[in-house]
Amino acid sequence: MTNQYEAVGLKAKEYEGIVEMLGREPNELELNLYGVMWSEHCSYKHSRSMFKHFPTSGPSVLQGPGENAGIVDIGDGLAIAMKIESHNHPSAIEPYQGAATGVGGIIRDIFAMGARPIALLNSLRFGELEGDARVKYLLEGVVEGIAGYGNCMGIPTVGGEVYFNQSYRGNPLVNAMCVGLIEHDAIHRGTASGVGNSIMYVGAATGRDGIGGASFASATLTEESEEKRAAVQVGDPFMEKLLLEACLELLKTGSIIGIQDLGAAGLVSACCETATRGEGGMEIDVLKVPRRETGMVPVEVMISESQERMLLIVERGREEEVNEIVKKWGLHSVIIGRVTNDDKLRIFEGDKVVGEIPAESLDSSGAPRYEPDYAPPADLAELQKLDIESIPEPRDLSSTLRKLLASPNIASKEWIYRQYDHMVRTNTVIKPGSDAAVLRIRGTKKGIALTTDCNSRYCYLDPREGSKIAVVEAARNIVCSGGKPIAITDGLNFGSPETPEGYWQFRESVLGLSEACREMDTPVISGNVSFYNQTEKGSIHPTPIVGMVGLIEDISKTCTMAFKEAGDIIVLLGQTKAEIGGSEYLASIHGQEKGKIPHLNLSLEKRLQKEVLALIQGDLVQSAHDLSEGGLAVGVAECAIAGGIGARVEVNTELRNDIVLFSESQSRFLMTIKPEHLETVQERLKQSNIPHEQLGTVIGNELQMQINGNVVVKESIGELEEIWRGALQCLMESMKID
């Protein structure tokens, strides 16, 4: 028979610790509160000990990890708030609502800081798409959910990434990122301080949806998980839009001491987090909490994850001022408690105390911490072995390029992003489909560049080096758009931390991210960890997603990947080596997921990025694109397709033809230069000791690639574009979903 504490997800030692701390056994309500608050999703009990490795401060960081979102200065008294969070398990069970409420939750985190949300991004992972109706159902539902919520909120979804791999077959990943704009003096935090100040509840009424959501997100997905649809929240974007406007207006009045959204674990989480930050306590009465269902008991009220709700700490005597503004926006507000001078979270049901717990003991800072044993997977050494000579070289490399452009991981994601409103508010300068999205900051000359990145196949084969590559690839995308990378938010998605292999993958990824962020001067200002992304058949590939923001001082100096004019000179920065381990070429063409991933030289990477950005800002670059999945051939094709113009490329090398075309060697940029600027650019690259070579010319309507004088690729740009743009839509339409 299962013990009561096991039923709420606690271990025997954890329960014993609770009894010792309280000096008594917890009652049913208290036990349930510990169950959700000490779940992995809320407590970070297996990951928190690794956070110390992250660089989290810097001259531009105004708020690092620990609040609802991180904030970084962009000058002119303005700042950017940003955060990424996962909603993986809910999206696996109920893809539309799972994705929609993931978007809603991250938006609330941003406006809880006092920032107006200005952009959304996402990073998605699914199983192999071809011939799998279940994967198509999940993809359709997730995309519709993201679009349905973001579009209704009037916040543009400007970028993201989508990858397909069989490791995500039963456990898709849905990571949502939100970015907000805020003035320095408007920053607010989730702190409950000032004894006697009122605790006010604002927004939607509380129901039973989402009960146990935090615990559900902290468990392995099984066949029985379908029965837990009640743990998936239901969102209302129109309610959230009203809530956003009401909260931003309230924050301008000076009446709000602290503000916190009701997200994972609902009311109990918001109460204990704000009380702990304020180093005090709190009393609340569950009978005063608005409900939309009858018969709800205190524990249901406390842990419900109903959406579109906020907790406000209001200066005593100004409650009516709050009520009037909330009412103006068609919402409901009510006083449910007050700040106290002890350290307790005291829960009343009318006059009766039904729970009394030290607030800090519920908070993640008071939860147990674990540092499990770790070891690399037993088959890792074998996985990393790859004899390139055993890989047959395709006879028709044009056909190989066409196949790669049709791969769902490389093909255009237009089928997805055309469902998103990416132009609402008319600040989007560079739209989805380029290396990074770019938004103007109205009233200034500035802009920001935004991207999300992670090659999870690299992280599967080498989590530390793969995580470094995630950081620098994000930075490359920012730089290619004309921005200087300034900060990241990380979404760390892994399997179980309770296996040596799972924790080793997580630990290695954190160390890799930390090293790269330190070298690239991009502090980690916020983030999220999602463990137990696995099914009974196995774990997902390690997926540490990097969301990055870059600053563009002069919005007129942005850059895109598109080839611009016939006669422009194509220049490759960096060196191509025999590195196809973990590549899209090896996986898509040869069906192998193995090998040593490409080597990364962080020092060279930093020098390269600095020089590329300087060249773009100096108006010496026509187009810029980083080379990643698919290598040189795919990169040139993408630039040609984007510009609607062809290219002639010539390479002299001792490498095999397929390796020249499809190697994914790191620290490479493809740029086009006007002929009159070529000498200047080459001299600057030479002075900076940047390896580079002139590859060819932008010309005509064909892509022609020669290696050692032999034409190995000759394709019509129009035909390549048709393949690239149509591949994903063709796959989605090949098996209609009822």
UniProtKB/Swiss-Prot annotation:
One of its GO terms (cellular component) is cytoplasm. Mg(2+) 2 binds at residues 109, 261. It holds the Pfam family FGAR-AT_linker. The active site is at 41, 87 (proton acceptor). It is found in: Cytoplasm. GO terms for molecular function: ATP binding; magnesium ion binding; phosphoribosylformylglycinamidine synthase activity. Its main location: cytoplasm. ATP binds at residues 44, 83, 490, 527. It catalyses: N(2)-formyl-N(1)-(5-phospho-beta-D-ribosyl)glycinamide + L-glutamine + ATP + H2O = 2-formamido-N(1)-(5-O-phospho-beta-D-ribosyl)acetamidine + L-glutamate + ADP + phosphate + H(+). Mg(2+) 1 binds at residues 85, 528. Pathway: Purine metabolism; IMP biosynthesis via de novo pathway; 5-amino-1-(5-phospho-D-ribosyl)imidazole from N(2)-formyl-N(1)-(5-phospho-D-ribosyl)glycinamide: step 1/2. Keywords: ATP-binding, Cytoplasm, Ligase, Magnesium, Metal-binding, Nucleotide-binding, Purine biosynthesis. Substrate binds at residues 86-89, 108, 233, 305-307, 530. Belongs to the FGAMS family. PANTHER family: PHOSPHORIBOSYLFORMYLGLYCINAMIDINE SYNTHASE SUBUNIT PURL. Monomer. Part of the FGAM synthase complex composed of 1 PurL, 1 PurQ and 2 PurS subunits. This is Phosphoribosylformylglycinamidine synthase subunit PurL. The gene is purL.
